[in-house]
Amino acid sequence: MHELLLFASVPAHQHHELLQQLAGLTAMQPQHRLERRLVFKAYRKPGLVNVRVGASQDLQGAELQRLNKMLNGGMFYTQVVGPVSEADFGAPASPVADQDAHMSGTDEKLSVRTHYYDYENQPWKLEFRDIPEAATRSAVTARLMSSASLPKGDITVPMNAWGYNFVTEYAVEGDIFIHNDIVIFLHRVLHYPTESQEPRRQLPALNEMTPLDRSGGYVLQAAITVQDGGNQETMKIASQHLFGLREQLKSAVRLEQADRLSLDTRAK
């Protein structure tokens, strides 16, 4: 699959107004999204990865095929993405089941009201993004992409077995809009207050997270996924749709092609 994209910087003071404009353009309310994004780096040469390990036994055949293709294609940085909610930030880790069973009636009522972050049941998906093409067909960012479901919970063991080491993690907060075949994501990157050598089992309070852009700015990303990147006509039509959106939003933001090397995912 191919992904075609345009990007724009959005100052903090313009965020609310742009949300309203996008809601009017797409005739929908924004869908708020919070994601954990774990960054892994390949340390093993392609062709040596066997995805049939450990928790991956629960994955369907089609997912395993996609994983094989992604993980054996070359040495890249790749992201493992998991959806979370605002309530997960600052929530205590999920207690052990046998401890719950011995709670008194009062404690049981309290536990119902308490939200826990259950890391062991955190869903994940692997997102592969190639370095954007050097000679694009038009003034859009074009790159190969793929994604596949992963086992829930602690993902480091299977990722290590597949030849990937954990590097770091961050969070993304934003709002999604759908405009015909375009996915519009107005978002910002959030850093954790401290570094960790492994994925966190408990998340800090959301107000402890710091924006990557200290000015409070956001990024507007407009993306179209094309199943057959070799079909020139389909790619041309997708590009034209992005240009149409750029024209509709030109009074508010400047959608443009990203710098290719800033999106380089190759592991050096």
From Swiss-Prot:
- What Gene Ontology cellular component terms go with this record? core mediator complex; mediator complex
Protein's cellular compartments: Nucleus
**Record key words, sorted:** Activator, Nucleus, Transcription, Transcription regulation
On whether RNA-binding is a keyword of this UniProt record, the answer is no
**A GO MF term:** transcription coregulator activity
Has UniProt tagged this entry with the keyword Transcription? yes
UniProt record, GO biological process: regulation of transcription by RNA polymerase II; termination of RNA polymerase II transcription
Q: Which Pfam families match?
A: Med18
Annotated InterPro entries = Mediator_Med18
Job description of the protein: Component of the Mediator complex, a coactivator involved in the regulated transcription of nearly all RNA polymerase II-dependent genes. Mediator functions as a bridge to convey information from gene-specific regulatory proteins to the basal RNA polymerase II transcription machinery. Mediator is recruited to promoters by direct interactions with regulatory proteins and serves as a scaffold for the assembly of a functional preinitiation complex with RNA polymerase II and the general transcription factors.
As for family, the record states: Belongs to the Mediator complex subunit 18 family.
Q: What does the subunit section of this Swiss-Prot or TrEMBL entry state?
A: Component of the Mediator complex.
List the protein's name.
Mediator of RNA polymerase II transcription subunit 18
Species in which this protein is naturally found: Neosartorya fischeri (strain ATCC 1020 / DSM 3700 / CBS 544.65 / FGSC A1164 / JCM 1740 / NRRL 181 / WB 181)
